[in-house]
Amino acid sequence: MKVQVAPKKQLTGKIEPFDSFWEAPEDIERGYATFGQFYEHNYLKYIPQDRQSRILVISCGPGYFVNLLTRKGYSAVLGIDSYPSKVAYATSRGLNCVVAHAFDFLQETNTPFDVIFVEQEINHLTKDEILIFLRLCWENLRDGGTLLMHSLNGANPITGAEALAQNFDHYNTFTEYSLRQVLEYCNFQDIKVIPLNLYVFYTNPLNYVAMALHKVNTLIFRFNFKLYGKFNRIFTKKIAAICRKSQGKVAGVIEAGHHRFDGRR
């Protein structure tokens, strides 16, 4: 049975709704190169090698990730975004993108995907909406299918609090622990939470300075967190999760033993 969700107008985000992409630069054309490099470095290794894999890109915007996958030879990629102007930019480049609201699309489609990639931060959804969204993703993945999504990192002492406050439609942040926690609750498995590396533009000398400073900050942050009994390890501005749909379970039903105290709370 499909999860019943509220129509799009009842979702909480209004100014920058979740089912559109809001991170594109003013020079949209330039974003195909910069975001393409960022996505290739951080995500491409987690996409199945089979070029026939059915891949859904949610909140695709002008099609940055769709463009990367298409260039890499993937032939069954579909991008959806709720803003027609952004989709028009993608289709003008010959990319397979359509106008659709994410929740409605996931509720209505009947053909499962091998991969669902969420291009917009999930922080644009409330906690209740995130649970519904994850259940919808679950229902639209094949057994063993892969979900990739990302979030603002609340563990970063410099950007964590500001990231929550700087956008009216940011409703939460996550840490490595809480991102894993909600995916376990929705019965995803093989969960891997990774830092998203911003410093992937290796032709820019300042990139290496930023990488070095980030490593120093990470050591300082880890030391100070341990002073308070915390064991956070990831302090990048954003984090991502890669997980798989487990077989023989029901979405949203947590199994005994998943909750545990391990000092991260």
Model regions and ranges:
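Conserved N-terminal segment of class I S-adenosyl-L-methionine
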Residues: 1-119, 128-135, 236-239, 248-265
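Hydrophobic/aromatic residues located in beta-strands of well-ordered beta-sheets
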Residues: 77, 147-149
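A C-terminal cap/extension of S-adenosyl-L-methionine-dependent methyltransferases
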Residues: 97, 148, 181, 192-265
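A short His-aromatic
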Residues: 123-125
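Short glycine-dipeptide loop
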Residues: 141-147
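Short, glycine-/aromatic-enriched active-site segment of Class I SAM-dependent methyltransferases
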Residues: 149-172
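Short alpha-helix
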Residues: 171-187
